[in-house]
A protein has these predicted regions:
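C-terminal catalytic "cap/lid" subdomain
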Residues: 2-273
Length: 273
């Protein structure tokens, strides 16, 4: 059939005949990204840092979150805490691969998500099952003041092998970061049991100095032996398009969570660069 009589619609696609491993082609895909949930805040509640600490720590955090939820939209991620560490110990002893460890830790984090959801249920916030969370998040966040998820990115069996050891590198801090980046959220706050990032582990060194603000590049260069968040966040900050910083605050001082959500510098800020 000649070009003059062919009435079929032909879709023009810039990538149709291109190799997706060609660097020049990949460079051409650097285009603006839409922010799907620009007014929502992602807050990671540490499993070991907060939930495992018991009623005396958890209830004041719940009261603070309830107060924030009256005016802000929150996406709450939760870690697996001590149960995940126990499962890791068993799995490592049995020779389980990294992907299986990631799958098991997601189950522990999911349990903590339901605990947090039970405590926040009076405020209209519940835990959403991971299989539907990502697809329906915009609906949930517009229908309720906040939602809770298990924090684990769904790499599961496809988790990346770490450079050292077998612990999954993308854990709940990374999952919360990636969610905030994908949906273009307003901020990411990591709630821990320390005041922020220190030059040494403050639990072992009384004279450790708090680092109030630092770039991901500088933090990587320093190669500190201990960080209060997943180390892979430093690499993720370097490639993120929408999320350019996060703040680490102490959940044992719950008023700092609200201050951080309101844009105040009350912990350690790690920024891209």
């Amino acid at each position: 059939m000649s070009a003059h009589t062919d009435r079929r619609h032909h879709v023009q696609s810039g990538l149709m005949r291109e190799s997706l491993v060609d660097k020049s082609v990949i460079r051409s895909t650097e285009t603006p990204v839409v922010r799907m949930l620009p007014e929502a805040h992602v807050v990671k509640i540490g499993g070991r840092s907060v939930l495992d600490a018991g009623r005396g720590v958890v209830y004041p955090v719940i009261e603070t979150l309830a107060r924030i939820l009256a005016t802000k939209k929150l996406i709450l991620g939760v870690g697996g805490g001590v149960r995940t560490r126990h499962v890791f110990s068993i799995g490592l002893d049995l020779g389980l691969p990294t992907g299986v460890l990631a799958q098991l830790s997601a189950a522990d984090a999911n349990g903590n998500a339901h605990i947090l959801g039970t405590l926040l249920a009076p405020y209209g916030v519940v835990a959403i099952p991971p299989e539907m969370f990502g697809h329906l998040l915009p609906l949930f966040i517009h229908a309720a003041p906040g939602v809770i998820f298990n924090g684990m990115p769904p790499y599961s069996l496809w988790e990346h092998p770490p450079g050292l050891g077998r612990i999954p590198p993308h854990r709940t801090d990374a999952g919360c970061f990636l969610l905030a980046e994908c949906f273009g959220c307003k901020s990411l706050v990591l709630v821990k049991d320390v005041d922020g990032v220190y030059d040494k582990d403050p639990k072992d060194h009384a004279g450790a100095s708090l680092i109030r603000e630092i770039s991901a590049t500088e933090l990587e260069r320093r190669a500190l032996p201990s960080l209060p968040f997943d180390r892979v966040l430093l690499r993720l900050l370097g490639t993120a398009r929408l999320l350019k910083k996060f703040q680490v605050v102490n959940g044992h001082r719950p008023e700092l969570i609200e201050a951080a959500i309101n844009g105040k510098h009350v912990g350690s800020i790690v920024f891209a660069g």
